[in-house]
Amino acid sequence: MPDLANTPARSERAMLLILAGIQFCHILDFMIMMPLGPFLISALGISTHEFALLVASYSFSAAVAGLLMAPVVDRFERKRFLLGIFLAFAVATLLCALAPGFVTLLIARGLAGIFGGMMGAMVHTIVADAIPFERRAKATGLVATAFSVSSIAGVPLSLLMADAMGWQAPFLLIALLSAGLIWFGYKALPEFHGHLNSRHQGRAIRQMIAVAIEPNHMKAMLLTALVIFGGFTVIPYITLYAIANVGIAADQIPLIYFLGGAATLLTARLIGALADRLGKVIMFRVVAIAACVPVLLVTNIGSVSLMAWLAITTLFFILVSGRMVPLLAIVGAAVKPQERGAFLSLNATVQSMAMGLASMLGGLFITEAPDGLISGYGWVGLVAASFNVLAALWVSRVAIRD
């Protein structure tokens, strides 16, 4: 395993930028599905229920991928494994663009979810392997800017392309970007062998179970689930609530993504730097508790001006996504290096399952009134805020082993 602590800063930054690009591709691939809903429903002649299956197939496939990946991931060199699954992801995304109907698109989305879920876990594994703990939160913040760039440029550009060339265009764009990044990754990413020298012998399934049931690992995975429930109970229904209750026009929705993404592009690295300076646990608690404010505002505000709504949603983006920066550093340090790949694969499974379950939990509270307004969203906000408080209390139980 290379010691990037002593390599030139330029090499380390190049590695982090490539990893951020890989994150951008699979995050955009996931994010774009919900705003593409009207295009897909019209073009494929599907129902809203079938569209929901298209969205859910990615998360649940990613969860399955984590289970499949965990027993074997630490037996492979990191760079080759990442680029291999990235290539498979690019092919699956290309199949999405070529899908002629609902069933084939559903299968392609499932495949994209499998490899996209693996990619996310492997990116964070490499960051945890390569960057010393005292600088890891800042590095994680740089990689996390992939979410911001997806929101600022990826989603608006994809919607413009879909409007001009059809719903297939965004998937073609992602496949082409992935192909370019695979080449850059092959040229610039270092190889990682350190975990291979200290891997445990024995059956893969037995090793995975041992990693999964280790008490500190379970505490870290529970922390991840609490954080996801603290945001994803709310996130899937923001657009619906904005249009029905706040009075935001449909063509103004991209502004939410653009401004929120632009803000997090700046704040993710700031939060990471503060976490390195003040402490990951302290910074996580501050951001998680602060996130309760925009969570409750977004779900209870009612009809307000566009400017007021954008201010609230931008704060929501900053703090809800900002929790992930110290969280990923804490979770990555909760495991020994030789078990990190397997653990983060399992943690990715927990994250994907939590996303699906959280969105379903939020849906249990939400109903559409006869006048078209959305009711029950305020209760969703209270539930999400409660999970954030629980996460802030629970984080100190996770032991740092790096």
Language-model regions: role of each:
Residues 64-103:
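Conserved MFS/SLC helix-loop-helix module at the cytosolic interface between two early adjacent transmembrane helices
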